[in-house]
């Protein structure tokens, strides 16, 4: 099967979040399963800095962006059997970052037009064209409405994956003819219109042959007003083509037996290396080195979506317990300042590291006893899966992908891989936090059993890619 991905980012070339991880891992896993896979990405300046001497210049052409003709340079790099094709235009993509510019609408309108026209020029006409999030959500519309006259495109099946419904690509209706060069008809009849704006995500949902999200629970949640971000009505209408598939993680990278970023390796049969890592982490961040105290790790963006308003609200109560909390992350300045203040107020209990450091992140995943992830909503989440690979038990809000990947501890059966609370409130966060600490202190055997169960869970991309392969096959 020929599968082509189009996305705004993809590891290792460009990455700001979970989307980049997926584009870096899923195509590679599909190649292992015997498929022919290509990926179309923007050629950012950070891509050029890291891979400029490895990419191959193929050719260039021009694409119409409204009334203008814009340069499209095409580069290629084959990595892990995947053919990565890069759209090069320094005006749009040499910005020092991936997102956040005033003209993001124009940048990704250009990218989508270039990606659609590129398929014919590289002679890669896929069986399945898989697009991701709003940045590429207009591609199914373009294939079926603007480029339908190209015979080679008429049998392409399109799939849209929603990684985060909160970001929808809402722009003025004039973009349709000023940038995409299409008529007003589909806006006038309401197909592309939502809240008096052109809505790219709505277009993708309606025009894609199948819509996926990154967990089954999130697929259910976004059909409700609470999580639907004003598109729940459309998603309920299209629920027959909506499916959730949990992301995977790269189990070769996140492997406690071989991880090169760890000083001490371990496995589920011998966790002594985890204790050595815990001692080293406590020493590194300036906390008292104690084996008996539970270490709670946090690696996250500090935002309301990630639940840190709840954490800050309850932090004084949490720090009354015999516990150490090690935080790594940046985000909302108010949360950064709050954690910094608590770090000064409780120097023996809280280490607030307001930065991002890949090595420290790995050490926190591997050395902590508990991993705190109280997200308000979480389409999938990867951190909880990474933590479990290292025998670190997640404490999560029971929502989205967290619900699908973390089995809450059952005191009667001893089964579970972590702890969860259902009601998003400070009371239940604190109650669950204290229950986890109590189990850690009182029942070492039960705790070790939970660690072993967590480390046995299969979060590899092989499982996820098999689900995607079956989905693709069902559409052909």
Curated annotation (Swiss-Prot):
- State where ADP-alpha-D-glucose binds: 15
Pathway participation: Glycan biosynthesis; glycogen biosynthesis
Gene3D superfamilies the UniProt entry points to: Glycogen Phosphorylase B
Q: Which Pfam families match?
A: Glyco_transf_5, Glycos_transf_1
UniProt keyword list: Glycogen biosynthesis, Glycosyltransferase, Transferase
Keyword check for Glycosyltransferase, yes or no: yes
User: EC no.?
Assistant: 2.4.1.21
Give the reaction(s) catalysed. Answer: [(1->4)-alpha-D-glucosyl](n) + ADP-alpha-D-glucose = [(1->4)-alpha-D-glucosyl](n+1) + ADP + H(+)
Provide the top EC class.
transferase
| Entry-linked InterPro entries | Glyco_trans_1, GS/SS, Starch_synth_cat_dom
Q: Which GO terms describe its molecular function?
A: alpha-1,4-glucan glucosyltransferase (ADP-glucose donor) activity; alpha-1,4-glucan glucosyltransferase (UDP-glucose donor) activity
Keyword Lipoprotein on entry: no
- Example GO biological process term? glycogen biosynthetic process
HAMAP family in the record, alphabetically?
Glycogen_synth (MF_00484)
Q: Which family does it belong to?
A: Belongs to the glycosyltransferase 1 family. Bacterial/plant glycogen synthase subfamily.
Q: What does this protein do?
A: Synthesizes alpha-1,4-glucan chains using ADP-glucose.
Q: In its UniProt entry, what is this protein called?
A: Glycogen synthase
Q: Which organism is it from?
A: Streptococcus sanguinis (strain SK36)
Q: What is the lineage of its organism?
A: Bacteria, Bacillati, Bacillota, Bacilli, Lactobacillales
């Amino acid at each position: 099967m020929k599968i082509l991905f189009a996305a705004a980012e993809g590891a290792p070339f460009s990455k700001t979040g979970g989307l980049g991880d997926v584009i870096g891992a899923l195509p590679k896993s599909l190649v292992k399963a015997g498929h022919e896979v290509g990926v179309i990405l923007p050629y950012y300046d950070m891509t050029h800095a890291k891979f400029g001497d490895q990419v191959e210049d193929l050719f260039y052409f021009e694409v119409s962006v409204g009334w203008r003709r814009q340069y499209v340079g095409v580069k290629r790099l084959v990595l892990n059997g995947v053919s990565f094709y890069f759209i090069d235009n320094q005006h749009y993509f040499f910005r020092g970052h991936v997102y956040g510019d005033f003209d993001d609408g124009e940048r990704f309108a250009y990218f989508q037009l270039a990606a659609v026209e590129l398929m014919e020029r590289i002679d890669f006409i896929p069986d399945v064209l898989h697009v991701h999030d709003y940045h590429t959500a207009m591609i199914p519309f373009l294939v079926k409405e603007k480029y339908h006259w190209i015979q080679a495109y008429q049998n392409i099946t399109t799939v849209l994956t929603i990684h985060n419904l909160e970001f929808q690509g809402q722009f003025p209706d004039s973009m349709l003819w000023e940038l995409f060069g299409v008529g007003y008809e589909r806006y006038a009849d309401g197909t592309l219109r939502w809240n008096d704006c052109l809505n790219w995500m709505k277009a993708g949902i309606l025009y894609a042959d199948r819509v996926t999200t990154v967990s089954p629970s999130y697929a259910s949640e976004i059909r409700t007003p609470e999580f639907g971000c004003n598109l729940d009505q459309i998603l309920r209408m299209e629920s027959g083509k909506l499916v959730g598939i949990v992301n995977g993680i790269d189990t070769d990278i996140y492997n406690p037996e071989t991880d090169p970023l760890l000083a001490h390796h371990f496995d589920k049969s011998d966790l002594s290396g985890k204790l050595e890592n815990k001692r080293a982490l406590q020493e590194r961040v300036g906390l008292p080195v104690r084996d008996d105290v539970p270490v709670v790790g946090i690696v996250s963006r500090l935002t309301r979506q990630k639940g840190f308003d709840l954490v800050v609200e309850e932090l004084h109560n949490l720090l009354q317990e015999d516990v150490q909390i090690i935080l790594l992350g940046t985000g909302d300045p108010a949360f950064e300042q709050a954690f910094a203040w608590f770090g000064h107020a409780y120097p023996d209990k809280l280490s607030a590291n307001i930065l991002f450091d890949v090595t420290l992140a790995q050490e926190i995943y591997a050395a902590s006893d508990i991993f705190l992830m109280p997200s308000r909503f979480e389409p999938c989440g990867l951190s909880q899966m990474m933590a479990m690979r290292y025998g670190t038990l997640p404490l999560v809000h029971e929502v989205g992908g967290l619900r699908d990947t973390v089995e809450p501890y059952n005191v009667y059966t001893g089964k579970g891989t972590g702890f969860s609370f259902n009601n998003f409130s400070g009371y239940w966060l604190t109650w669950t936090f204290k229950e986890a600490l109590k189990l850690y202190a009182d029942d070492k055997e039960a705790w070790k059993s939970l660690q072993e169960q967590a480390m046995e869970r299969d979060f590899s991309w092989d499982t996820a890619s098999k689900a995607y392969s079956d989905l693709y096959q069902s559409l052909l």
